[in-house]
Regions:
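N-terminal beta1-alpha1 ligand-phosphate binding loop
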Residues: 1-25
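Structured adenosyl-cofactor binding patch, chiefly the S-adenosyl-L-methionine
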Residues: 107-150
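Short glycine-/acidic-enriched loop or helix-start segments at secondary-structure transitions
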Residues: 15-17, 75-77, 105-108, 127
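Short glycine-rich anion-binding loops that position phosphate/pyrophosphate groups of nucleotides
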Residues: 10, 69-72, 100-103
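Short, surface-exposed alpha-helical segments at coil->helix boundaries
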Residues: 18-22, 51-52, 106
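Loop/turn-to-beta-strand initiation segments
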Residues: 2, 91-97
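Proline/glycine-rich low-complexity loops and linkers
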Residues: 99-100, 111
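S-adenosyl-L-methionine/SAH cofactor-binding core of RNA-modifying enzymes
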Residues: 30-93
Length: 150
């Protein structure tokens, strides 16, 4: 299984969160980070453009998990089970998508295969990328029976 973390907005590569994210990325050879940036000031148009760009990053034989505060709170084991089911159904890629500063537009919410919340709190992009990278690593270790997840 290949993994992607795709996000809308700018990245601050020197932040502590980015350093930790890279630590998990080094442990996984099958992960790609994608960034898309939309500069329009109109919020409605921005949500639509960001959603469209982020949707295009998910391959046709892939699945999209949208990070959204109104999503479902899955446990790590539940996420690992979802990933395992998709892998057994011959889906090759899972794209974890993080919306922009104004959240996610209607189109991407409707097209997401799963919507995941990291609790009810709002988190900065850098921290969400770090948490998603860690969860991907955790899922990978759960599926391989590695003792990282206890």
């Amino acid at each position: 299984m290949k993994y992607m973390i795709s996000f809308a907005g700018k990245s601050k590569p020197s932040s502590e969160e980015e350093i930790i994210t890279k630590k998990y990325l080094r442990r996984l050879s099958n992960i790609i980070i994608n960034q898309c940036e939309v500069k329009t000031k109109n919020i409605e148009l921005r949500l639509k453009e960001e959603g469209s760009k982020l949707l295009k990053l998910t391959p046709s034989n892939g699945k999209l998990i949208l990070l959204d505060e109104q999503g479902t709170n899955f446990s790590s084991n539940e996420l690992a089970e979802i990933v395992s089911d998709w892998e057994n159904s011959n889906f090759s890629t899972i794209n974890f998508v993080i919306g922009g500063a104004y959240g996610n537009g209607k189109e991407i919410k409707e097209k997401a295969d799963k919507t995941l919340a990291l609790g009810r709190l709002t988190w900065p992009h850098q921290m969400v990328k770090m948490m998603v990278a860690e969860q991907i690593y955790r899922i990978d270790t759960i599926l391989k029976g590695h003792p990282y997840h206890k």
